């Protein structure tokens, strides 16, 4: 699973160079500190979960769920009439770029393509906008199989 995770991080970093940080999500946006331990815009990948089905002989097939979060600081005044409403469109384009980068991507011979299953947008304290995408893919794991 680690090779898949690292491959996803590398793909995002290579395809979206305007991100200042691409990292594993370990709660950086939920910190109680006054400042976030990340730079923006950033992509955080985590909350991996799998439901497994035994195939036999130590081999399993799983459906893996993975969450990606694009976080952007929003200090521009973007109300209608401000002249900076284009900033909203820029954020949405960047969020869509994260989605299209991962949609149908494969990161191992043992996995199927990644498909988006859920989208959620929300704000965090400190004027941070988060675009969250949940992806699923099938994974064939024979790491416990006896030779």
Predicted feature locations:
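Charged, amphipathic alpha-helical segments and their flanking helix caps
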Residues: 1-37, 44-147
